[in-house]
């Protein structure tokens, strides 16, 4: 998907499960505007492997695509062929959304710093202490009051960044993707201690690896590295965050 400066959304590629938002499962080989969002000014978008999401300038969240595991947040498992508003968040102003990579979870961040999660709950990636999934947005209470400013979803894990520069991760732990120095699963948001004090200002998440940049421009990487995706000239998996320049 692509978002223009005037708030229009275009999508293209494989159309299975209606994830392109064009009211069909047909694929598209060039960018096409999503007609259902033309009357809205969109400010943020996110793509999962089988579902998509968009946030309007007024804080409304829309999702569409595969509905399995409740990943769309509409209270059911129904696939949506066009964008549909997530009514369970209509009392909140949503400012960011993240869709799971190769996965079925979704995260949303509101303007008052609250994080909501829903969809498949395997390995605790929804951040509420268990592995149960849910089909409507539920608050990740562990992150209340810590000033979250960015959220991301990888494959079977989730990440959040606070305004104070702390990185929190949770979910599946193999490939050391969580950055805690262990391959154990973590079912509630937990601070990545090795980055404490480094003032992280932005994070990026792949399917199985993560990057974080500090206010001084240093970049740290951790997780899977089988294709050299950490940029450290090796294919060795990092158990903990490793700085590279």
Regions found by a protein language model. Give the residues of each.
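Conserved core positions of repeat-based scaffolds
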Residues: 1-2, 11, 51-54, 63, ...
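Structural signature of WD-repeat beta-propellers
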Residues: 4, 15, 48-49, 56, ...
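Plant-skewed but cross-kingdom recognition/interaction modules and surfaces
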Residues: 8, 56, 60, 100, ...
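Conserved loop/turn at the beginning of each blade in beta-propeller domains
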Residues: 24, 38, 46, 76-79, ...
